[in-house]
Amino acid sequence: MRILLVSQMYPGPDDPDLGVFVAQVERALAARGHDIERAVLDRRAGGKRRYAHLARRTFATARRFRPDVVHAHFLVPSGLIAALAARAPLVVTAHGRDVRNVGAVPAVAAATRLVVRRAAAVVTVSDYLRRELETKIPEARGKTHTVDSGVDLDRFRELPAPDGPPRFLHVGSLTPRKNVLRLARAFERLGEGTLTFVGDGPLRSQLEGRPGIVLTGPVRHDEIPHLLANAHVVCQPSLIEPFGQALLEAMATGRSVVATTIGGPPEFVPPEAGVLVDPADEEGLVEALRAAARLPRPNPAARAAAARHDVNEQARRLEAILERAARGRRA
């Protein structure tokens, strides 16, 4: 197939970690023999003007490339741009924030409804997100499919675990939604080991100087396996997590996890691979940390659970949806 990829997030020289999950799926599709052209934004800078640039690039590439199908990541703005720019059948993948924004901004809801009506198929990265989208945009019912971003099992290999007291790791932004302050308090109440936060955000100052807590700041995505090699348990007790890519990557290396019950993680974290916890329950989070620290190191069950989400298998499932759309049938 000739596939036009449209995305407002894609790795580039200035932002090599921007939309790595988009590039990961694209590589897996290309490895299956498809001809892929991109109309993408590969940097965060530029404000809203960059979306005009994406629109121009999408129109030009669609005219030149004449794709069999268009695959857009994010409902708005990428999906909207793709819906307006290309005549080929459209498949759009929703990742989370694009669905949350539907209820926050009326114009976004209207644009999303247009995209969903235009699309031959809508892919969501979790069943949780699919249900949310179908509730907000009933027109999505009957054309939604759940295919997550998967994990590269060659890049995230099973790793031996270090000895010693429990080493907890959090990978993500230091924001209220990620629930990092409650995680820090629960760790302090646990009273053993270390907790490393990888990332940055507005709550950094409230985490600095706490005993046993380490702040690395932002790191490149290709450095994450090294950090996982020095951890026992990866924690993501977010208030909501549409999917949970960091958890899946951690599990692929054999790391047990502590994950939120709200969102996508319950769909891929079985009891033997980690502990699910109500993100508002601080006492429960303390016990979740304690229980996860007692799981095997490394944890073969975590690796096995992650292997069911191999990016190559996810690409095969996405390929089937794209092919049906390209043939002009509802995918």
Where are these regions (language model features)?
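Carbohydrate-associated surface elements
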Residues: 128, 150
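Nucleotide-activated donor-binding/catalytic signature segment of Leloir-type glycosyltransferases, i.e.
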Residues: 205-222
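Conserved acidic donor-binding segment of nucleotide-sugar-dependent glycosyltransferases
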Residues: 271, 275-282, 291-296
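Short hydrophobic beta-strand element within catalytic cores of glycosyltransferases
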Residues: 256-259
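A charged, aromatic-enriched C-terminal amphipathic alpha-helix characteristic of glycosyltransferases
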Residues: 17, 296-323
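Aromatic "clamp/platform" in nucleotide-sugar-dependent glycosyltransferases that forms part
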Residues: 239
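Conserved donor-binding/catalytic core segment of Leloir-type glycosyltransferases
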Residues: 4, 160-188, 195-196
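Short alpha-helical donor nucleotide-sugar binding micro-motif in glycosyltransferases
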Residues: 116, 218-219, 226-231
